[in-house]
Amino acid sequence: MTEIILVGVMLLSTAGYAFFGGEKSNVEKLDYKGIKFSLGDDGLWHFLIQEQEFATTNNPKETENISSNINLKINDYSQKVLYFSQDSDNQGLQEIARNIERFTTRMWKACLDNCSEDLPIKNCSENIIIIRESSESLIKQEENCVYILFNENDAIRASDAFIFKILGI
C-alpha cells in the first residue's frame, strides 16, 4: 500500500511540474529589426548586441516617435571620457550610464560655461551629453555635443532612443 501511495505522489509531482513548473512562457518578448528583446523580472527590456547585454526601460517600438538626428555610434564613446552637462536630467543620465559606461574610460559631469559647481568646463570638441526638458522630445547633435531633449516626464524614453540610435537599432 505504501508503494502505491509513493508511486502516486511521484506521478502527481511529475504532472504538477509539467503543467505548473519550469520556465515562464508568458515572458513578454519583442523581435525588432532582428534583435530579440525580452522584458525581465526587473522591469527592463534586455537584449544582446555582439554578445554584449543591454537593459533599457523602454523597447525601441516605444521610442519610434522621438526624432533623432545624430551620426554617432557606440564606438565614438569607446575608451573615451564621456561628459554630461551638470544640469542633465539624473534619470536619463542613469539610464545611459547603465548601458554605455562600460565602453567609456569614465563618465563625468561638466559645465558648458561657468557654473557654481567645481566641475571642468568643456565644449563640443569633447563628448558631452546634455539631457534637458524641452517643448518636444528629440535628439540632435552639434559637433560632439548630443542634446537629448524631452517633453515633460520623458527623459528616460528619450535617453533610450539615444541608446538605440548609437547601437544602430
Language model segments and positions:
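Secretory targeting signatures
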Residues: 1-26
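Aromatic-residue detector
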Residues: 7-10, 28, 34, 124
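Alpha-helical transmembrane signal-anchor/signal-peptide segments
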Residues: 22-40
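Long, folded non-catalytic interaction modules
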Residues: 39-169
